[in-house]
Structure formats: C-alpha cells, structure tokens
Design a protein with these regions (language model features):
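Beta/alpha (TIM)-barrel catalytic core signal, keyed to glycine-rich beta->alpha loops juxtaposed to Asp/Glu
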Residues: 45-250
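Short, acidic/polar
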Residues: 16-31, 96-105, 203
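Intrinsic structural disorder
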Residues: 1-2, 30-36, 219, 246-250
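Structural motif corresponding to the early beta-alpha repeats
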Residues: 1-19, 42-46
Length: 250
C-alpha cells in the first residue's frame, strides 16, 4: 500500500511555506498513525505571479500558489521534508493556469507525481476556476511527454459522467459547470447503454486505458460505488475501438 496526503497552501511569504507544509503533514501523520507518507501533494492551483484568476480572483492568494513561491519556497520545502524522512516523494495537483503548469512540469526540478484531470469531456468543471481556458488534455500530454507519474482525477467529472447527479446545484452557482457537463454528456450515457455498462464504470475504464496513467483516484461516497469501481478495474482496459469512440465523442 502507498499513502498520500495533500496541503492547500495558497501563496505565503517564502519563510512561512515550510512551516505550513510541515504542520499540515504532521497533522496527517498523527491522524493516520504513521511516521511518513509515500506522496505529499501541493493541493493549491498554480499560476504565474501576475495572472488574474478567471473566477474568484479575490481569493487568489488563498486558493492558488504563484510560480515564484512554488520555485523558491515550495520545492525546497518538499525536498527538506524528504531529507527529514517524512515523505518519499512530492507532487502537484495539475490544476491552474495552463502556462504555469507547463513551466512547473518542465522545471529543472520537476514534480515527482502529478494529478491530471482525465475524462472524455476534457473538463475539470467547477474546479477550473483559475484559468477559463484550462485544458486538461494539454497538461496530460505534457506530463506524458516528460514521463511524470500520473494520478488520474475527475474520472466521472463530479458526477457528470454517471447515470444521474447525486445532488442539487449549489445555491451559489459555483458548480453550474458540473451540471452543464451532465447535460453535455448525454451521448456518453447513450454509448454506455449501447455497450451495456454503467456510465461510471465506463468512465473509470476510460481513465485506466490512457497511456502512462499509474493510478485513478476515486471520489466514491459509499461501498456500493467503491465496489462498482473495483469491478470496472477488473474488467480491464477498453477495447481500442471503444476508447477511440469515447476520445472523439466530444
């Protein structure tokens, strides 16, 4: 078994970054009764220093990490935690501004793992609030090109690629993109029915079929959903023609 945890850092003064990451990690280790984790992820979205968020820019310092902070403070802090034996590896969330992520991936000290949004819709939905032009496929391809270990996220795109949404839209309107994606995904559900497979199972198998993906991160709420994901994994990768049909569906 491999264990991971993450920290939503934001943008802090450089001298505060290690302490914040170490505090978060220490709390996680205490909660899990462990001495170290295999992977520690930066959970804040990356952006260039002067980039304005497409949405919620007033929360920029809290919800995103600037590249200068990432290069000058976050990477050294992660490396220090490795030297201290508290983590084996570190990585990034793979969300944020396209250009910032490409620079992070190609930096002289690249992340040792990256979470990549991966689904047939090529959509991060509501969490793509930093860059309205966020392109998950572009980040995935850049990660593949650089042979970064990839953890797939948003396989069912917050429910949009399941049989039905499991919640009502939030009153703030924050998650309207997820519900818009559900409507847009109607052809996907039609294909799933044609192939006699649940939409959620098909979406997870799609993610598992993508080259160089090491793991698919699940967002299940109960054992029924977990068992469905396990069965999807047991079915294995999609046939080439199925994968191609889904890849070109939208």
């Amino acid at each position: 078994l491999n264990f991971t945890t993450k920290c939503s850092l934001g943008t802090l003064a450089d001298e505060q970054v290690y302490d914040r990451l170490n505090l978060s990690l220490t709390k996680s280790l205490e909660n899990m009764n462990m001495e170290k984790v295999n992977l520690f992820l930066l959970h804040s979205q990356l952006r260039e220093d002067d980039f304005k968020l497409s949405n919620f820019n007033e929360m920029r310092e809290k919800n995103s990490t600037s590249l200068s902070s990432y290069f000058n403070a976050v990477i050294p802090a992660f490396e220090k935690l490795k030297q201290e034996g508290k983590i084996d590896h570190w990585g990034i969330g793979g969300l944020g501004q396209n250009e910032a992520l490409v620079k992070a991936i190609n930096h002289e000290i690249p992340p040792e793992a990256i979470q990549c949004v991966l689904n047939p819709l090529n959509s991060a939905g509501a969490i793509a609030y930093v860059d309205e032009n966020f392109d998950p496929t572009a980040i995935l391809k850049e990660s593949q090109k650089n042979n970064l270990p990839i953890l797939s996220i948003r396989a069912v795109q917050a429910g949009a690629l399941t049989g039905s949404m499991d919640r009502e839209p939030h009153s703030s309107g924050f998650d309207h993109k997820d519900f818009d994606d559900y409507v847009r995904a109607a052809p996907f559900r039609e294909l799933a029915a044609k192939w006699d497979e649940s939409p959620a199972s098909l979406a997870h198998r799609y993610a598992l079929s993508v080259s160089k993906v090491g793991s698919v991160i699940l967002g299940v709420k109960n054992r029924i959903e977990l068992k469905e994901c396990i069965k999807a994994e047991e079915k294995g990768e999609l046939a080439t023609e199925q994968f191609s049909a889904l890849k070109n569906l939208f």
